[in-house]
Amino acid sequence: MAFGKSHRDPYATSVGHLIEKATFAGVQTEDWGQFMHICDIINTTQDGPKDAVKALKKRISKNYNHKEIQLTLSLIDMCVQNCGPSFQSLIVKKEFVKENLVKLLNPRYNLPLDIQNRILNFIKTWSQGFPGGVDVSEVKEVYLDLVKKGVQFPPSEAEAETARQETAQISSNPPTSVPTAPALSSVIAPKNSTVTLVPEQIGKLHSELDMVKMNVRVMSAILMENTPGSENHEDIELLQKLYKTGREMQERIMDLLVVVENEDVTVELIQVNEDLNNAILGYERFTRNQQRILEQNKNQKEATNTTSEPSAPSQDLLDLSPSPRMPRATLGELNTMNNQLSGLNFSLPSSDVTNNLKPSLHPQMNLLALENTEIPPFAQRTSQNLTSSHAYDNFLEHSNSVFLQPVSLQTIAAAPSNQSLPPLPSNHPAMTKSDLQPPNYYEVMEFDPLAPAVTTEAIYEEIDAHQHKGAQNDGD
């Protein structure tokens, strides 16, 4: 089984393996040919920039070997100058600059002064930008943070050469006049160049920085006095103007931090920029809270309007008003109908009774208008039982109900008996032909309101035979 390096090892890639060999401590001096070969691989492969940066991180991370660190810095310098934006954009990230290069400045690594100055020079030069639109905001942030901590950056070789030329020119031709101090907006030099301010320029710069400080104090006071949702209109207008001016001044301060060489001026610029940035962040937070409160008020207003309006038109709602009452006949109409029906021995109920009655199940039949009608006991009991049931006023008029007609029955006292009568035999005396009178029967109508059939069945019970038998016994 062959043992090899893991794919997670940065040295396992082709470019990583070359970087490991070129920066090994056993190498006597920089192999520039090998360095150029590494640059070619970075430029010609898709994963070359990423793999190269990973290998460089591993070489300088927690490395106490000064020889390997020096060789690695030389390789980094050559790759930055000869590789494209894909490599440059990775090398200027905070992850590489702050987590690897800046940590080498820790005293525990005990780096020589020339190596420390080389690292600081890298950070300062990269913060000034690259051609091709490479984002250097992260390395610039690291640079400003180091300046704020009081780290002194050495002048670059170009700056040292320019300073020597200016010194020689001043010594040969002393100036006859003092240049006018430019404003803050004019103390901006082109990229990859620095500016050495004269005392007049420094004084002018301090006066403009004082104006920026005053604007910051005014912005802070307005933000403290106003509350989102109940702010003063005039204060908000002034705050917007100060915010716009502060944004412009912040951009100029950032440009000055890159080109100005005076350490005292740089420290003051950093402090003013920090105060201005806090004021700008406070204004943006105030604006967000203001927008949120406006949206909440708008939503509450819409919710109030929604609850105050009916959810549906009134014509679509259920009509719970009482139903219209049935038309009633007047007293004159009742008298006229009584006169017309007098010949039929019918009479209409009085107006008082009519007013207290509900509409009957079948309005076309007025059962209460019958007079002198003999109602059998069975029908009376049935009517008493039915009165306790519910009356359905809305029963359909075209129902196929069969109405029971009252039947006149003879009232004959019968002997009380608790048992049902047995059927008469065929040879019973009451069934003989000599009997002249036919037997009398009670006609009992059996009515079941829940039965599905529409016909009724009559049950006949012979009573006369019982009576004849009793009379015959008495005669004997």
UniProtKB/Swiss-Prot annotation:
Q: Which organism is it from?
A: Homo sapiens
> What is the role of this chain?
Probable adapter protein involved in signaling pathways. Interacts with the SH2 and SH3 domains of various signaling proteins when it is phosphorylated. May promote FYN activation, possibly by disrupting intramolecular SH3-dependent interactions.
Sequence motif SH2-binding, location on chain: 460-463
- List every position bearing Phosphotyrosine: Y460
One GO cellular component term, please give it: extracellular exosome
Family the UniProt entry places it in = Belongs to the TOM1 family.
Q: Which InterPro entries match?
A: ENTH_VHS, GAT_dom, GAT_sf, TOM1, TOM1L1_GAT_dom, TOM1L1_VHS_dom, VHS_dom
* Pfam families (UniProt xref): GAT (PF03127), VHS (PF00790)
Region of interest: Interaction with PIK3R1: 442-445
| Residue ranges occupied by any VHS domain in the UniProt entry | 22-154
The Gene Ontology terms for molecular function here are:
clathrin binding; phosphatidylinositol binding; protein kinase activator activity; protein kinase binding; SH3 domain binding; ubiquitin binding
User: Which domain of life does the UniProt lineage start with?
Assistant: Eukaryota
Give the GAT domain ranges: 200-288
Keywords, in A-Z order: Cytoplasm, Endosome, Golgi apparatus, Membrane, Phosphoprotein, Protein transport, SH3-binding, Transport
Task: Tell me what this protein is called.
Answer: TOM1-like protein 1
